[in-house]
Amino acid sequence: MPAEAGREIVVAKVIEARAFCNNEVAYLAWKTDGKIKDCLGFMITRINLDTGERRLLPAWVAFDTQSNPDWEAQDTSVWPIQKFSWRDLTLRRSRDTLQVRAPFRAKYEIVPVGPEAPGRAAVPPSPTAQPGKYKGTPIPMFVCGEAGETNEFSVTDNFGDVSAFFNNGILSTQNLRKQLETPDGKAPTKPQIDAHIKKPGDPIRTFLTGDVLPALKSMFARAEQEDGTLHLALYELEDTELVDLLVQNQARLNLILSTAGSKTTKAKPAGMAAAAKTMVKRSKLVKKATKKKSIATMAKKSAKKLSAAKKTGAAKKAAGKAVKKTKKSSAAKPKNVTVWDVTNAAARAKLSALMGSRLQNRMFNNSAHIGHNKFAVLLDRNGKPIVVWSGSTNWTKTGLCAQSNNTIIIESDAVAKAYFDYWTRLHADKLPVPKPLSAPLGSDQGPALRTADATPNSTTLDKGKTKIDLWYSPNTPKTGTPKNRTVPPDLQFVFSLMKQAKDAIFFLVFNPGRTDPEGEDVNTVVSAGIDFGRLDPDLTVFGAISDPTALPGFVAPPKDQPRDEPKIPPPAIFSPEGVPNVLMIRAAAIKDLIGDFQRELLSAGHAIIHDKIVVIDPMSETDCVVITGSHNLGFKASYANDENMLVLRGNRPLALAYTTHVLDIYDHYKFRAVLEQQTRDIMLKGKPPPKRPTGKGFLQTTDKWQDPYISGEKGKELAYFLR
């Protein structure tokens, strides 16, 4: 952080500050020329350069002599920021309105503030402060150092031929608790949030989807404008609003819809007649002979030795087995019965009735393979591919609202043609269609598709300034899991770019696969990041992971653990010993009361962080890289799934937009991961879980909060952005 650690300066100042953003959030970082005497934090003002409007950023965390039990917003003139970085979560939309600010240019002013002292000017009264809305004695703020300003930046979703959009799909927030009017001491529930996110136009749904839903809806307006057709390949399709849009525009659609979701239940023993029925039906000969007979009658006749004239030897064998089964009737053990495609079944039926053969059922109906794509290609009225929509967002209410996700739109004939060619290959790679559609299958992709997918499509955007490589899956020769995991071609390319990183690698992943904590298995971006971070101590590797099993060091809880014993949480933070430049955290929520923070809801489904993003050297004009798409960035995605992955190089504004999203998610969950890791560490020592987490959850009333930043213990990632 500051140039000379530990040096106090009476007249101190912010010597450098930088800011960058995406369509939802801005990230800013700054440094001073030393520890600022008496500094209680920084007052931050966003300046709209188009209108001249100055707006203090909101703040919710009170000083430790105060309390904000109702989570009412003040601003940073009341409760300053006790960090050297911040996220402006109200960049385009405030918490109390659905109004979205149009694209604009902005910068930030950062002012050190502290208590009254000779020569210090008082902070002027602010219209966004709310005196009386919190408990405790107010602490008037005075300017205690020279202000600094960030660079100017554009608030936009457009980055040349590419547009990028990010949702607000974090549920574990105090703001959501407040909107849901959750009682103190309780966490919001899944039914509570589900009631809002499934309802088109609901304010909570609208906020959580951000610009991702409008971006997806824009494809239909564009198709009408072009009088064109849309070719889509989707994994999950359940959201009512999006399904209705498909229905309304079905005449323009060609859809490949994969299997999504399954439900396994234990079947009850069905007695003598049902047992006989099950076994008899498995023999075609017996089935033919029983077309006009009840199953119960067949069971009785099979017990009396069916004559050879009526049955073949094979039928006798089957009937004999049926008799043995009927003898056990009530003692028969329940069997697991799996019903497939529970997520898509309703939408599939509705669209199939309208679209006929223009809807292809891509039914894997097994857990080994999934059609994981979520993309659309627009063809103009002449059949020419012109635009692509892709990203990580599934077409479900949770994909839109209850997970972190992104959507990317690319205006390029070459890119659109590559995606349409892939769509055509998928369509030609026909899978068996089970009857009923929910029945189990062992389907996988064919060799022609795999061979074609092993070669990427490469082109340029923005008149040659942006390079783009397009990879599709599956791209390994074999359908099954190979014994020796040779790195697939798409991951080889990704790892080669990570290896070339000069300064930083940032990532967000759902579950790329289990990761060896030693980083020896370079089949996921997580393990590759560990490897490259070990090799280069100057390489910053930061990331957030959704699934606890994908965080290095995960240990499954004992299966025989008594139910009444408190469960030790899985690891929440990972940094290899002696490698502080590598830090990975997993998604977590506040489970215990800390300060004014109340319990939170972590998820409304399985995924929490659903992005599949790697950003390399985002500050570089020429070497920056963005990797995105549907690919989970691990081995299984390459050999088992239908996937698409985009690798964009040389577009710095785009790279910084994706970096902002990564840092937004990472910063949010890091605080919560630290709390959960503290609980884990205590319980591993055989002690009971703490009644309250370590840490007070309030702002400090002295300048000591700066010390860990001055020493370098905190804020390691800031050095990269401020060099």
Residue ranges and their predicted role:
Residues 443-541, 550-552:
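Beta-propeller domains
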Residues 419-422:
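Interdomain helical connector at the RecA1-RecA2 junction of SF1/SF2 helicase-like NTPases
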Residues 204, 208, 411, 486, ...:
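Catalytic cores of large soluble enzymes that bind and process phosphate-bearing ligands
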Residues 217-223, 227-229, 494-504:
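Short, contiguous, well-ordered secondary-structure segments
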Residues 208-221, 488-491:
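A short, well-structured juxtamembrane/interface segment
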Residues 2-199, 213, 217, 224, ...:
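PLD/PLD-like phosphodiesterase catalytic module centered on the HKD motif
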Residues 156-200, 208-209, 425-487:
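Active-site cores of enzymes that catalyze phosphoryl transfer or operate on phosphate-rich substrates
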